[in-house]
């Protein structure tokens, strides 16, 4: 979950936005309630000598959690995401989503999401990606690459579909974070978060400061909080994890939906129009002949 994206927090280097947008042009997540966030700020390079700020114990905790997640051939969990969004009064408002996640490595994923706004469903079976909005009975379908990691990338680039907790689902959660890691230190233990004893670690990577709580015994993430360091408002992003099940048998048919298959089709495409700089140039006008 620390994946080089650290719970999705570190994807700022790819200018990812927090709201989950569906190809149908409707918000699938908290943004549907008006919590649309600005793109994360540009990332920074690690300062010279940053390696001296990397505490071995903190790295050991992150690596152990990554190894536990990567070794699971199947898993399910619940993720509650809370995103702060500026209000007209000044103090931020909070919008939340609750996602029930099931995956089977290397090529199966299901995310059923409730939100402060319309619910959404996402299915991936190794060949096809399906984004379904039950309230509108609209579905977007697209061919998909053969791995969960590649499918998550494709869903984002093609349709702005993004899960803030995607980093617990990738094949190697620790790999990316290590590339831009600027500092990491061990805070101590907590017996308050997640109903168990957790190790608390703070780290900074790719312009994001993260505090994470990881089960001391089972090595599973329980909560993470992040702030983009160049965000002038220092808005907080939080993910709480619960109901972890690793290695359980996944029911046949879990990665498809008959209701979605029967819904009205819409293009699997980015919901926002391309900015002027990315829009194709208008055709040159043809001078009319003088009569």
Spell out what each predicted region is.
Residues 2-6, 28-39:
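N-terminal acidic, proline/glycine-rich, low-complexity intrinsically disordered segments
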Residues 19-30:
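Bacterial N-terminal signal peptides
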Residues 46, 53-138, 210:
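N-terminal mature ectodomain segment of secretory-pathway/periplasmic proteins
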Residues 131-169:
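Acidic/charged, solvent-exposed loop-and-adjacent secondary-structure segments enriched in E/D, K/R, S/T
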Residues 56, 80, 115, 130-131, ...:
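Gly/Pro-enriched, hydrophobic low-complexity segments
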Residues 34-56, 257-291:
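Compositionally biased, proline/threonine/alanine/serine-rich low-complexity intrinsically disordered stretches
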Residues 2-21:
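Bacterial N-terminal signal peptides that target proteins for export
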């Amino acid at each position: 979950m620390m994946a080089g994206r650290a719970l999705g927090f570190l994807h700022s280097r790819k200018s990812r936005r927090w709201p989950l947008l569906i190809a149908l042009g409707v918000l699938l997540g908290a943004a549907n309630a008006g919590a649309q966030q600005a793109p994360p700020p540009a990332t920074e390079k690690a300062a010279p000598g940053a390696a001296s700020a990397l505490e071995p114990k903190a790295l050991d905790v992150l690596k152990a959690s990554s190894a536990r997640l990567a070794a699971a051939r199947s898993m399910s969990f619940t993720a509650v995401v809370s995103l702060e969004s500026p209000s007209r009064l000044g103090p931020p408002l909070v919008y939340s989503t609750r996602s029930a996640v099931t995956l089977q490595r290397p090529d199966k994923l299901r995310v059923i999401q409730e939100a402060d706004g319309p619910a959404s469903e996402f299915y991936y079976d190794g060949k096809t990606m399906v984004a379904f909005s039950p309230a509108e009975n609209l579905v977007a379908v697209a061919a998909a690459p053969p791995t969960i990691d590649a499918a998550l990338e494709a869903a984002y680039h093609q349709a702005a579909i993004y899960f803030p907790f995607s980093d617990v689902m990738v094949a190697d959660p620790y790999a990316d974070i290590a590339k831009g890691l600027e500092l990491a230190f061990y805070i101590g233990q907590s017996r308050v978060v997640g109903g168990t004893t957790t190790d608390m670690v703070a780290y900074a990577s790719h312009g994001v400061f993260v505090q994470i709580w990881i089960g001391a015994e089972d090595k599973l993430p329980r909560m993470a909080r992040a702030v983009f360091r160049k965000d002038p408002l220092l808005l907080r992003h939080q993910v709480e994890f619960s109901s972890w099940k690793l290695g359980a048998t996944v029911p046949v048919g879990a990665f498809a939906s008959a209701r979605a298959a029967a819904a009205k089709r819409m293009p699997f495409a980015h919901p926002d129009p391309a900015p002027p700089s990315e829009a194709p140039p208008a055709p040159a006008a043809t001078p009319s002949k003088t009569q």
